[in-house]
Amino acid sequence: MEPNPSDPVLTDRIQAIVTTEKSIDEMMKCAREIIQDLGKEKQIGKNKMEDNANNFKKLITQVENELSAQMQYLSHVCVGSSHQGSTFGVLQNSLLAQSGLSSLHSELFQIVRYLDPTSDEPQTTEEDEEDGSDDLNEDGADGAPSSTVTSSTTDGSGGGDDAASSSAPRSQEESGRQMTDDDDDMEQ
């Protein structure tokens, strides 16, 4: 399997596994030499046996540490916690924040309409208009504005929450208010 050259983290992890595999091979060779030396009638010097034993201990510690690190990484990936290369949590937090922002815009618009029923259009600042132009670029990939943005800006009821709430509830509220205004005119 050829590693993806565009992902250096993955390449490093695969290289670490290959190095660990080579360490396991060397460890097996050391163990084989120790067992062969012990099986001989005439044993080799004590220094050679100690060198092989120390080399084996060093290699087994390296392999254990590397395999533990790899297993810990895989356990993080499996349970979905944050790990190298994961953007799921960040994306989820961003979407949650956008949802909360649109909900706040909608509630604020309703409060403004409740407090000042004569004002059909909320007061927009230069900053809100700039935010709305950013929403246009995000909503339409080809640069064309979405239908909710177009309808809200043409009838004058849009304002700073272009994509924050649908146009259906606004039109129902406006039609309800117009009916009460018409009823008042008829009574007079």
From Swiss-Prot:
Keywords: Activator, Coiled coil, Developmental protein, Nucleus, Transcription, Transcription regulation. Pfam families: Med11. Residues 123-141 have a biased composition (Acidic residues). GO terms for cellular component: mediator complex. Residues 146-155 have a biased composition (Low complexity). Its main location: nucleus. Residues 46-72 form a coiled coil. Residues 116-188 are annotated as: Disordered. The keyword Coiled coil applies. Component of the Mediator complex. Belongs to the Mediator complex subunit 11 family. This is Mediator of RNA polymerase II transcription subunit 11.
